[in-house]
Amino acid sequence: MATDIDMLIDLGLDLSDSELEEDALERDEEGRRDDPESDSSGECSSSDEDMEDPCGDGGAEAIDAAIPKGPPARPEDAGTPEASTPRPAARRGADDPPPATTGVWSRLGTRRSASPREPHGGKVARIQPPSTKAPHPRGGRRGRRRGRGRYGPGGADSTPKPRRRVSRNAHNQGGRHPASARTDGPGATHGEARRGGEQLDVSGGPRPRGTRQAPPPLMALSLTPPHADGRAPVPERKAPSADTIDPAVRAVLRSISERAAVERISESFGRSALVMQDPFGGMPFPAANSPWAPVLATQAGGFDAETRRVSWETLVAHGPSLYRTFAANPRAASTAKAMRDCVLRQENLIEALASADETLAWCKMCIHHNLPLRPQDPIIGTAAAVLENLATRLRPFLQCYLKARGLCGLDDLCSRRRLSDIKDIASFVLVILARLANRVERGVSEIDYTTVGVGAGETMHFYIPGACMAGLIEILDTHRQECSSRVCELTASHTIAPLYVHGKYFYCNSLF
C-alpha cells in the first residue's frame, strides 16, 4: 500500500480528498472481519500517520529499500488500496500466481523513480511535515510503539516498516504542539528550555532529539526580575503647585504700611547724610603737599567736570603721584573704589562717556610710564560700573546702529571680549571696558597691557583722550540723520540731550 500511495503523491494527488481512501478503509475493515487471526490489527492506516518528506532521511532510495518484498496480497482483494497491503508469508503459497493488476492502479501506470536530489512539486511541497510531530487528536491506536516490527512481535518478516504518510487534512487536525507542552515557560530554567527537544510530549512519547519547538506565547515567557539597586528609591514626583505668593510674604508686604511714616523716612535721610560727611572713617588719603589734594579730599555739593579738567601733558606729569597715593593707602583706596562705583552708576550719558575717557586715559598714562595696571586701583577697578552704565544708556540706540552696520550685537561684544570685534569707537569702548572688568572680576594681581590692545614695547598711541565722548556723539548724530525710523531719531536725540518732555504719567504714594 505504501508503494501505491507514493505513486499517487508523486503524481500530485491528494489522497485525503479522494474516495479511494474511504473505499479502501471499508474494504480493510471487511478483510479484518473475515480474517480474525491476522496480526496486522495494530497497523495504522496510511492516511492516519504523520507524513514525512520522502526526500528526507535518505530520499526515495531509502523508502524503496524499506518496502517489503513479500508476495502480493490475495487475489480477491486486488484492485483496492488496502488489498494491496502485503500479508504474512505464512498465509500465501510461494507458487501462488500474482494478483491481477486491475482497477485504478493499472490505469495510473508504473511508479516513477524519485531522485533524492529532485524536489517534489505540486501538493507534496505544501504538505511537508513540520519540525515537530503533532500528536493525533484521536489518540488510542494512532501512536506507534517502538520495537514493533511490520507484522508485530515475532512476525515472520523482519523487514523494517516504511515511513507512513498522512494527508493534508489529517496533518492540519493535529496542528502544532500546544504551548503547555513546552519546557521554557514560566518556572523553567534556561537549561531546561534548551533541552526542550528531549522532553516528553503531551501524548507521553519522547520527542525526537534536536527537533525545534514552536515559540511559546508571549505570556508564557519567563522574565528575569530587575536587579535590586542599593540606592534609595526615587521619590515620586509631585505635581507642581500653582505659582502664587506665599501668604506669609503677603503679610510682610502689607505690614510696611504700619511702619511707614513721614518722620521715619526723614530720619533715614538724615542718618545717610551723616555717614557721607566722613566716608573714609577718619582715615582719608594724605593730601598734604599733593597736586591732587582738591580731589583727594571730601567735599559737599555736585561735581563740575570743568573745574577738574586737566590736559594730557598734565596727566603725564602728575599722574604717577596719584598712582603712588592709591598704592600706598590700600584702605583709603578701597573706600574710594566703593564711592566711585556708586557715583558712576548714576551718571547720564555725557557723564558716563567722560568716565570712560577717564579710565582709558589713566591706562594710557600707566603704559606711558611703564606702570602696572592694578585691579585695586580705584579707576581701573571700577571699569565694570562704567561699562554697565554706558550699556544701559546706549542700548536703545545701539540695537539699531550695530545691526545697520552689520556688527556684533551689544551683548555679544561684551561677552566675547575679542579685539578682532572692534570696528569703530563704539565697539572699541565696549570691548576694552569689558576686558578690564573681566580681569578685575577674576582677581588677577596685575593686568597685562595686551588687555587694552597694546603689545610689548608699544604705547597706546591709537587712543586720544576724549575720543570716547566725541566719537559716540558723532555716531549718534550721524545715525539719527541716516536712519529713516522716527523712533530711532527720538531715541538718539534724547540720549544726547536728556531733557524731560514726556513719559511719566503719575506718582502714587498712599503711605507718605
Swiss-Prot record:
Span list, region RGG-box: 138-152
PTM annotation: Methylated within the RGG box possibly by host PRMT1. When hypomethylated, ICP27 is exported to the cytoplasm earlier and more rapidly.
Pfam families tied to this protein: Herpes_UL69, HHV-1_VABD
GO BP annotations listed: exit from host cell; regulation of DNA-templated transcription; symbiont-mediated activation of host NF-kappaB cascade; symbiont-mediated perturbation of host cell cycle G1/S transition checkpoint; symbiont-mediated suppression of host cytoplasmic pattern recognition receptor signaling pathway via inhibition of IRF3 activity; symbiont-mediated suppression of host gene expression; symbiont-mediated suppression of host mRNA processing
Skewed-composition ranges (Basic and acidic residues): 228-240
Gene Ontology CC annotation, any one: host cell nucleus
Residue positions where Dimethylated arginine is found in the record: 138, 150
Keyword hit for RNA-binding: yes
Motif (Nuclear export signal): 5-17
Biased composition (Acidic residues): 16-28, 36-55
MF-aspect GO terms: RNA binding; zinc ion binding
Record bears the keyword Hydrolase: no
UniProt motif (Nuclear localization signal) ranges: 110-138
Keywords: Activation of host NF-kappa-B by virus, Activator, Early protein, Eukaryotic host gene expression shutoff by virus, G1/S host cell cycle checkpoint dysregulation by virus, Host cytoplasm, Host gene expression shutoff by virus, Host mRNA suppression by virus, Host nucleus, Host-virus interaction, Inhibition of host innate immune response by virus, Inhibition of host IRF3 by virus, Inhibition of host pre-mRNA processing by virus, Inhibition of host RLR pathway by virus, Metal-binding, Methylation, Modulation of host cell cycle by virus, Phosphoprotein, RNA-binding, Transcription, Transcription regulation, Viral immunoevasion, Zinc, Zinc-finger
ZnF (CHC2-type) intervals: 400-488
Compositional bias annotation for Basic residues: 135-149
Subunit-level organization: Interacts with host RBP1; this interaction facilitates the RNA polymerase recruitment to viral transcription sites. Interacts (via the RGG box) with host ALYREF/THOC4; this interaction recruits ALYREF to viral replication compartments and probably directs viral mRNA to the TAP/NFX1 pathway. Interacts (via the RGG box) with host SRPK1; this interaction relocalizes SRPK1 to the nucleus and seems to alter its activity. Interacts with ICP4; this interaction modulates ICP4 DNA-binding activity. Interacts with host NXF1; this interaction allows efficient export of HSV-1 early and late transcripts.
Described function: Multifunctional regulator of the expression of viral genes that contributes to the shutoff of host protein synthesis and mediates nuclear export of viral intronless mRNAs. Also stimulates translation of viral transcripts. Independently, plays a role in the regulation of virion release. Also plays a role in the inhibition of host innate immune response by targeting host IRF3 and thereby preventing production of beta-interferon. Silences the 3' splice site of the host promyelocytic leukemia (PML) intron 7a, thereby switching PML isoforms from PML-II to PML-V.
Family: Belongs to the HHV-1 ICP27 protein family.
UniProt name for this protein: mRNA export factor
Species: Human herpesvirus 2 (strain HG52)
Higher taxonomy: Viruses, Duplodnaviria, Heunggongvirae, Peploviricota, Herviviricetes
